[in-house]
Amino acid sequence: MADSLSKAERSERMSRVRHRDTKPEMLVRRIVHRLGFRYRLHDRRLPGTPDLVFKSRRMAIFVHGCFWHRHPDPSCKLARMPKSQLDFWRPKLEGNRERDLRLQSELDAIGWKYLVVWECELGHREQLENKLLAFLTEGDSR
């Protein structure tokens, strides 16, 4: 199927796609802040440029969209493979997943812990808060 937009129009439209400060990321940031934790954003020195960074704890949080990052949970309805243009989408989305796994391994190698928050988890606010709190207090002797 041919694209209805010119290459320049498509480029302009795609350049406006937000990579930071998305609604899911903002929600996680508000929850973490309300739990009493302070963080830095998007530290480019770390593999994968995590969304939230807790430098003194050597911890990072990624907020992933289920579709783009291929949420492996089979019950996630947001991670379904598109039905058309599979020759484009399959390598694109599988490449994203492989990159994420590689970057997570790099974080492990330098001694950082990380948590991935999936877009579909945002609807279960209390469970998400508990998950974030458990991750961020892991190893605390308080």
PLM feature spans:
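Nucleic-acid endo/exonuclease domains
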Residues: 1-142
